[in-house]
From Swiss-Prot:
<comment type="similarity">
    <text>Belongs to the TRAFAC class TrmE-Era-EngA-EngB-Septin-like GTPase superfamily. EngB GTPase family.</text>
</comment>
<dbReference type="GO" id="GO:0005525">
    <property type="term" value="F:GTP binding"/>
</dbReference>
<feature type="binding site">
    <location>
        <begin position="162"/>
        <end position="165"/>
    </location>
    <ligand>
        <name>GTP</name>
    </ligand>
</feature>
<comment type="function">
    <text>Necessary for normal cell division and for the maintenance of normal septation.</text>
</comment>
<keyword id="KW-0479">Metal-binding</keyword>
<keyword id="KW-0342">GTP-binding</keyword>
<feature type="domain" description="EngB-type G">
    <location>
        <begin position="33"/>
        <end position="217"/>
    </location>
</feature>
<feature type="binding site">
    <location>
        <begin position="95"/>
        <end position="98"/>
    </location>
    <ligand>
        <name>GTP</name>
    </ligand>
</feature>
<protein>
    <recommendedName>
        <fullName>Probable GTP-binding protein EngB</fullName>
    </recommendedName>
</protein>
<dbReference type="GO" id="GO:0000917">
    <property type="term" value="P:division septum assembly"/>
</dbReference>
<feature type="binding site">
    <location>
        <begin position="41"/>
        <end position="48"/>
    </location>
    <ligand>
        <name>GTP</name>
    </ligand>
</feature>
<feature type="binding site">
    <location>
        <begin position="68"/>
        <end position="72"/>
    </location>
    <ligand>
        <name>GTP</name>
    </ligand>
</feature>
<keyword id="KW-0131">Cell cycle</keyword>
<dbReference type="InterPro" id="IPR019987">
    <property type="entry name" value="GTP-bd_ribosome_bio_YsxC"/>
</dbReference>
<dbReference type="InterPro" id="IPR030393">
    <property type="entry name" value="G_ENGB_dom"/>
</dbReference>
<keyword id="KW-0717">Septation</keyword>
<keyword id="KW-0547">Nucleotide-binding</keyword>
């Protein structure tokens, strides 16, 4: 990634962001307009914390110590656009419901699964899914299920390792290589793994640049 692209994120991420909508089912989705970047991952993988760190607003996406708290598709956009006509934001960030919470009621899990699958299959403006993996645990069985779902939906996705401050720094390159090996033959996987720590602000600049490149926004 070039130095120019790595520093071009400021016009987009250097402004306030706002929450615009929680979507419990497909009929509540906003009209298709700006490109969408979605964040998926297991419960408590750090999705909300990562979104807050990306935009520099601690309270934007609600964080919780209770797994499975996010039960909707939560939409966030940069402030300063009317949302009407051509005055649309360049993109929207979407915080998806976490998966893999064993104590969640089955009907809730079924509803989340349907919402996520329908969204992945039927949203033309969805540009990429960033699948968050806890660096302490690596890719687990239900992560593999989501990878398969994304492959079947032909939805481009990229792996983002979270909480790298919780493991030894020397182990991060090895974990990246192990993760790359696991996704090497998956058709929809973007062949580059990002590593981040929301708490230590590690890897955020690279993730911002990757997102800007994905949506074609370079200032």
């Amino acid at each position: 990634m070039t130095a120019t692209k790595a520093t071009s994120d400021q016009p987009l991420f250097g402004r306030p962001w706002i929450f615009i909508r929680g979507v419990p089912s497909m009929k509540f989705l906003p009209p298709e307009g700006p490109l969408e970047i979605a964040f998926a991952g297991r419960s408590n993988v750090g999705k909300s914390s990562l979104i807050n760190a990306l935009v520099g607003q601690k309270g934007l996406a609600r964080t919780s110590n209770t797994p499975g708290r996010t039960q909707e598709l939560n939409y966030f956009v940069p402030e300063g656009y009317s949302g009407e006509g051509d005055d649309l934001p360049p993109m929207a960030l979407v915080d998806m419901p976490g998966y893999g919470y064993a104590k969640a009621p089955k009907d809730h899990v079924d509803a989340w699964t349907k919402l996520v699958f329908d969204y992945l299959r039927g949203r033309a403006t969805l540009k990429r899914v960033y699948l968050l993996i806890d660096s302490r645990h690596g890719i687990k069985a239900n992560d593999e299920d989501v990878l398969t779902l994304l492959d079947k939906a032909a939805m481009s996705y990229q792996i983002v390792l979270t909480k790298t401050d919780k493991i030894k720094e020397a182990g991060v390159p090895r974990l990246i290589e192990e993760t790359l090996e696991k996704i090497r033959k998956r058709p929809a996987a973007y062949p580059f793994v990002l590593s981040t720590s929301s708490e230590k602000d590690k890897g955020l600049k690279e993730l911002r640049a990757a997102i800007c490149e994905t949506v074609g926004h370079f200032g």
